[in-house]
C-alpha cells in the first residue's frame, strides 16, 4: 500500500484592524462556543499550549511595537501577520504530545531566523481540532524599522521562497516531509482559514438538509436540491 505524502505546510494571512480581535478570540480560545467552526472540540481545548505567551491584547501589542519603532503608518496598514504552521494529518499519526511540541518548536525557530523574535505576539498550538496546527502572530516590522508586510511576506515569489526555506529547515529533522505547494504554484485562490471552515460548515448543513428532504419525499429530493443551489 502506497503511503500518503506528508507535507510541511506554512501559510500567511494579513490583518489590518478590527479583524485582529477576531483572530485573537479564535487563537486564544476566549469564546465558549465556536458555531462557525465545528472542528473545535472545546472538551479538548485544555490540550492546547503556547510556545510564545501573549503579554497583552494582539492589537494593543501591535500598536505598542509600531509606536516604539516610530515607523510611518497608514489607516489601512497591515498591523499583524498570522502564520499558520501544520503538516499533513498522516505526519502527526502516532506521535506523542512531546514529539508534536518539538515539531512546532522547530517551526518557531525557523520564523525567528527570518523575523525578529521580539515582534512575535503569540504562538499557540491547537490540539482541539482535527489536525494539530500553530497560529503564530507577529508585527511585520522590517530590520530597518519599517512596518511592511509586503516586504516580509511579499508577492508570489517571496511566498514561494518562504515555502522553500521552511521545508529545507524542517526536513533536516523529519526527512519524510515533502514541500507543500503554494497557491501561486497550484493556481488556486487562497481562502483565509476562518472563511474556509465556515464554507465547509455550510456545505455540511446543506448535505444534511438534502438528506432529510430525501427521507421525507425521495421523489422530490432532486427537485429540492436544484432549488437550494
Q: Where are these predicted regions, by residue range?
A:
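N-terminal nicking endonuclease/strand-transfer module with a His-rich metal-binding environment
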Residues: 1-229
Amino acid at each position: 500500500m502506497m503511503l500518503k505524502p506528508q507535507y510541511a505546510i506554512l501559510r500567511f494571512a494579513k490583518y489590518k484592524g478590527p479583524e485582529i480581535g477576531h483572530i485573537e478570540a479564535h487563537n486564544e480560545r476566549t469564546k465558549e462556543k465556536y458555531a462557525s467552526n465545528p472542528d473545535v472540540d472545546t472538551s479538548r481545548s485544555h490540550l492546547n499550549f503556547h510556545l510564545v505567551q501573549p503579554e497583552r491584547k494582539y492589537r494593543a501589542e501591535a500598536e505598542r511595537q509600531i509606536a516604539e519603532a516610530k515607523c510611518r503608518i497608514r489607516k489601512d496598514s497591515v498591523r499583524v501577520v498570522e502564520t499558520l504552521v501544520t503538516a499533513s494529518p498522516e505526519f502527526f499519526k502516532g506521535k506523542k504530545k512531546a514529539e508534536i511540541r518539538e515539531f512546532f518548536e522547530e517551526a518557531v525557530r525557523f520564523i525567528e531566523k527570518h523575523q525578529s523574535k521580539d515582534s512575535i505576539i503569540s504562538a499557540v498550538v491547537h490540539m482541539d481540532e482535527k489536525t494539530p496546527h500553530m497560529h503564530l502572530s507577529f508585527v511585520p516590522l522590517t530590520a530597518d524599522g519599517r512596518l511592511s508586510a509586503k516586504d516580509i511576506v511579499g508577492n508570489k515569489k517571496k511566498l514561494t521562497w518562504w515555502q522553500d526555506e521552511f521545508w529545507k529547515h524542517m526536513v533536516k529533522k523529519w526527512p519524510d516531509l515533502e514541500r507543500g505547494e503554494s497557491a501561486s504554484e497550484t493556481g488556486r485562490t487562497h481562502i483565509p482559514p476562518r472563511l474556509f471552515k465556515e464554507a465547509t460548515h455550510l456545505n455540511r448543513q446543506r448535505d444534511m438538509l438534502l438528506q432529510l428532504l430525501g427521507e421525507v419525499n425521495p421523489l422530490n429530493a432532486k427537485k429540492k436540491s436544484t432549488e437550494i443551489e
